């Protein structure tokens, strides 16, 4: 299923050492085999992944920026958050199309004025004292605008959460589409 494929990509991307990983299919395959042998990734997950897709991401301009940040200890992945926002500015989770984001009514309860939004940020890194936010997507969408429409609100919540938590500005927000093989700036 699409969700299993997405999870398989996310689990592998979470483990890759961006600071040393070469953007080559063989390097991705070797890393995955090591994770499988160590019991932290499964062969079933790996069967859902195209190593060439991940190698292409690693070699992309955004992937190279992530690698540079990782080399300085400034890359963070799979970061959970909870964000308080006014109820008037929330949207239903059905309109978010993402399982990684739930409104308080589904997750932790709400008040008359504020609600809590929780999620997991795929990756962000510091660059020149500011934050670059990115989210991996495996959806089989074929137009950049479809990604912006489907995930814009979700990533706006992620941006707000990061700025609130870190006190730093998010200077760029990106989606990396494994289907399109490129980064999409929001």
Task: Name these PLM-found stretches.
Residues 1-186:
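Structural signature of nuclease core domains in nucleic-acid processing machines
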């Amino acid at each position: 299923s699409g969700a299993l494929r997405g999870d398989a990509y996310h689990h592998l991307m979470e483990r890759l050492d961006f600071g040393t990983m070469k953007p080559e299919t063989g390097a991705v395959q070797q890393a995955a085999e090591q994770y499988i042998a160590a019991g932290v990734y499964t062969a079933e997950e790996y069967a859902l992944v195209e190593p060439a897709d991940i190698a292409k991401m690693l070699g992309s301009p955004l992937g190279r920026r992530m690698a540079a940040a990782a080399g300085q200890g400034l890359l963070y992945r799979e970061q959970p958050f909870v964000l308080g926002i006014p109820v008037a500015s929330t949207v239903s989770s059905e309109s978010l199309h993402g399982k990684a984001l739930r409104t308080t009514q589904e997750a932790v309860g709400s008040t008359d004025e504020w609600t809590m939004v929780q999620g997991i940020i795929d990756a962000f890194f510091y660059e020149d004292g500011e934050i670059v936010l990115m989210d991996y997507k495996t959806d089989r969408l074929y137009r950049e605008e479809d990604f912006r429409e489907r995930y814009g609100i979700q990533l706006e919540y992620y941006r707000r959460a990061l700025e609130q938590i870190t006190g730093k500005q998010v200077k760029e927000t990106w989606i990396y589409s494994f289907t399109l093989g490129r980064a999409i700036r929001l």
